Amino acid sequence: MKRYYSTLLVLVLAHTSLSAYAHTCPDPQTTSLQWGVPPSPWIENPFSPNSPQGEENTRFVRANILVAGYGQGVTCTYRNSVGDFSILWQVRTKIPARVDYSWIETMGGYVCTRGLNECQFYVADPS
């Protein structure tokens, strides 16, 4: 019986550790965004004012968690000389905790403007 419980505990801990991996927006200097191509699984946001442009001075502006009852996706907005552009990852995300002051609750979800590494989010369903 102890063997059963220990095996169950290991499986639960493994699942928890795998699902608790923090994600951030892609870095425009070290990913395919430097060539104007969103890295997989990200896509160009269809509502973005501009297409992704490969430019040396591209910088991160903000991240948004889109909410419709629960997290429906993440958009990351960047700025360069052409203007702003955003990319989208349509994935279920966990809602940030109220004590996570990096994320500010807005009408349509949450926004983070602190920085690329500070705007961490958690995927609820990695598949």
Task: Go through each PLM region and give its residues.
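N-terminal signal peptide c-region/cleavage motif recognized by signal peptidases
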Residues: 15-17
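Mitochondrial intermembrane space
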Residues: 21-127
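Bacterial N-terminal signal peptides that target proteins for export
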Residues: 1-8
